[in-house]
Swiss-Prot record:
InterPro entries: Glc/Gal-6P_isomerase, Glucosamine6P_isomerase, Glucosamine6P_isomerase_CS, NagB/RpiA_transferase-like
Taxonomic placement: Bacteria, Bacillati, Bacillota, Bacilli, Lactobacillales
Protein known as: Glucosamine-6-phosphate deaminase
GO CC annotation terms, alphabetical: cytoplasm
Active site per UniProt: D62 (proton acceptor), N128 (for ring-opening step), H130 (proton acceptor), E135 (for ring-opening step)
GO biological process: carbohydrate metabolic process; glucosamine catabolic process; N-acetylglucosamine catabolic process; N-acetylneuraminate catabolic process
Function: Catalyzes the reversible isomerization-deamination of glucosamine 6-phosphate (GlcN6P) to form fructose 6-phosphate (Fru6P) and ammonium ion.
Gene symbol of the encoding locus: nagB
Length: 234
């Protein structure tokens, strides 16, 4: 695990840009992407840069169940606003939040992920150690699945919605087993509220109770953290 400590999230975005450029230069074709406030500065830096994804493919970690792609709170909309409109990929894939059959949708996405092997996977980490929507207790062998969001995750996501009642209660998420197949994983964490999760991920035992701790078993992980997120590390 390579740990890069930065002053703040803006500097973190600049470091992440270097990782993306190195991946492209080394021939990576498929990029696994994440959403939320953590990768926003990374996408800002990608948009400002001369990086070209026109021959690349993107696959996203997750999507809310029940939100149309044009819904402003959907992850499909987020990706367009923050990255795809300015830096289009040859192909971009997300789970379909409006799929009628959840099992079929998970199967479809897994087949897609087998076809497009992820060279670089971008991750954030939840306060409870989740990666994607793989909450504590998730199987380390998991594939794409429909997951009921924990109350802590619903609370954390409620800031993006007018009312907490509007926050979706389910999401489709890439499984931990699938995430671990990525050649390289880039995890970002910023802010004091991520410090406990970061400590558990890096220094704690590998346990399903801290899903991100499984990254200790991956051969090529880059962690970008700011001073606050790193504050509890030895």
């Amino acid at each position: 695990m390579k740990i890069i400590k930065v002053k703040d999230q803006v500097e973190g975005g600049k470091e992440a840009l270097k990782v993306f450029k190195e991946a492209l230069d080394s021939g990576v074709k498929v990029f696994g992407l994440a959403t939320g406030s953590t990768p926003e500065t990374t996408y800002d830096e990608l948009v400002k840069s001369d990086i070209d994804f026109s021959n690349s493919i993107s696959v996203n970690l997750d999507e809310y169940v029940g939100l149309k792609p044009e819904d402003e709170q959907s992850y499909a909309y987020f990706m367009k606003e923050h990255l795809f409109n300015a830096k289009p990929f040859a192909k971009s894939f997300l789970p379909n939040g409006m799929a009628e059959d959840a099992d079929q949708e998970c199967e479809r996405y897994d087949k897609l992920l087998e076809e497009y092997h992820v060279g670089l996977q971008l991750l954030g980490i939840g306060r409870n150690g989740h990666i994607g929507f793989n909450e504590p207790g998730s199987s380390f062998d998991g594939k794409t699945h429909k997951v009921a969001l924990t109350q802590s995750t619903i609370n954390a996501n409620s800031r993006f919605f007018d009312n907490e009642e509007d926050v979706p209660k389910y999401a489709y998420s890439m499984g931990i087993g699938t995430i671990m197949k990525s050649d390289t994983i880039l995890l970002e964490a910023f802010g004091k509220n991520k410090a406990e999760a970061v400590k558990a991920m890096i220094e704690g035992p590998v346990t399903p109770e801290v899903p991100a701790s499984v990254l200790q078993n991956h051969p090529d992980v880059v962690v970008i953290i700011d001073e606050e997120a790193a504050s509890l590390l030895k």
